[in-house]
Amino acid sequence: MGSSRADLLLVNGMVLTLDPDGRRFDPGAVAILNGEIAAVGPAERLAADFRATRTLDVGGCVVLPGLINAHTHAAMTLFRGLADDLPLMEWLQQHIFPAEAKLTEDWVYWGTMLACAEMIRSGTTTFCDMYLFEHKVAEAARAAGMRAVVGEVLYDFPSPHYGPIENGLRFTESLIERWKEDPLIRIAVEPHAPYTCSPSLLTRCNDIALRHRVPLIIHLSENEAEVEQVLSRYGRRPVAHLEEIGLLGPHLVADHCVALDERDLELLGERGVHVVHNPESNMKLASGIAPVPKLLERGVNVALGTDGCASNNNLDLFGEMDTCAKLHKAATLDPTAMPAETVLRMATAGGARALGMGGRIGELSVGRLADLIVVDFRKPHLVPVYNPISHLVYAARSSDVRHAVIHGRLVMEDRRLLTMNVDEVMERVRYIARTIKP
C-alpha cells in the first residue's frame, strides 16, 4: 500500500491519455485527488504508490478523456421528434417557434436534466449551451454534476425570456457574476447569428466577452440562405462581416461554418477562430457539409457538437464521431480524410480549446481536471482490439460507456446515474410534452 493518497483509483484498463504524445498505458491506471488527476501510468506502479478511498477495477475497458459537446441547445430535448423532414423555415415557423413561445424556466430545467442524463450515459462530460432561461440550464447542469459553458441567446427582437435586448445584455452580465467562482459552470456571451443581430449588438456582445474574458459564441454561415441574407443586407459574407466589425479572434467560437468560400477559410485561420462542426444536424436540415478538412489544413481548431435534439435527434457524440469521419470521406472521395484519431481529438482536446479550457480538460495528464469515461470493450462488436481509437470512432456505441467521472466525482457507475433520479426526470418531461402537443 503506497503513501500517496487518492480519492479514486481506476486500475487495469487501457488508458488513452490523448496528450500531444499520444501516451497510452495497458494495463494502466489513473489516480484522482481533489477533482484533479494526481497520476497516470502503469497499473502496477500506481496500485503500489497510491492509497485510495475508492478503487475501481476497469479491466477489459478503455479509459479516456470525457467527450465534449461543443454546441447544443440542451432543453430542446423537449422537442425531440416534434417535427421532422421539413424545410428549415417551415420547421422553425410552424413548429419550433410556436412551441418555444410556451417555454417556462421550469420546462428548461427539466429539459436540460434530461439532456444531462442522455449526455452522461453517452460519454459526454462537458457541454456548451445556447438557449433561453440559461440560469436554469446552469442550475440543471450543476445538479447533474456536469461541466458546462452556457449563455443566453441574444438577438435584436424580443426574447420569450427577457423581452428587450437591453434586459438580455444585463442578464448575461448577471450570469457571469453569479457563476464566476463555480468549478463546473462557465458563462459565455452568445449572440445568435449575423442575420438576427445588428452590428451594434454584435459589438456590444464582443465588448462584454472581452471585458470578462469569456468566450463569444455565434452561429455562423450555417447555410447558403444565411450567406445570401447577410450579403444582401450588408454587402459582405457573414465571416467578412464579422471581420469588418472586429469580432474575429481566438475568443470567438463559430458554430456550423458550412457555407464558406476560400476567403472565409483564410480569415478563420488567420484570426484563430474556433469552429464547431455539427455534421448530423447539418445533414438532417440539409444545410450542407462544412469543409472541415480545409479548415484543419489552415490550422483552425475544430470541435464537435450535436446541435439540439430537435434537429439531430440525439446528443450522442459517439454517433457524431462516426458520422463525421465517414461523411468527409464520402464528400471528398478520399478514404484518408478525417482519420479516427483526428475526429476523437475534435471531440476531446478540440472542444476543450474552443471553450477556453485547453489547459484543464481534454486529456489525461497530471494536474488536469479529472473528467474521464470508461468504455467497456468486452463486447462482441469491440473484439478483437488492434486499434482502440479506431474502435471508439467506428465501432463503439454510446451504450458501451460504463463509468463517467466529472471533476473527480463518479457521476455514473455501471450505467447507473448517481446524480439524479432519471425516472423522475423522464416523467416530468412526458408531462411537459402533453402541454407542448396535447
Curated annotation (Swiss-Prot):
Required co-factors? Zn(2+)
The residues listed in the UniProt record as binding substrate, with positions renumbered to this chain, are E100, H192, E222, D307
- Recite the UniProt cofactor note for this protein: Binds 1 zinc ion per subunit.
Q: Which domain of life is it from?
A: Bacteria
UniProt key word NAD: no
Q: What is its EC number?
A: 3.5.4.28, 3.5.4.31
What's the protein name? 5-methylthioadenosine/S-adenosylhomocysteine deaminase
Q: Which organism is it from?
A: Syntrophobacter fumaroxidans (strain DSM 10017 / MPOB)
Which gene is transcribed and translated to give this protein? Answer: mtaD
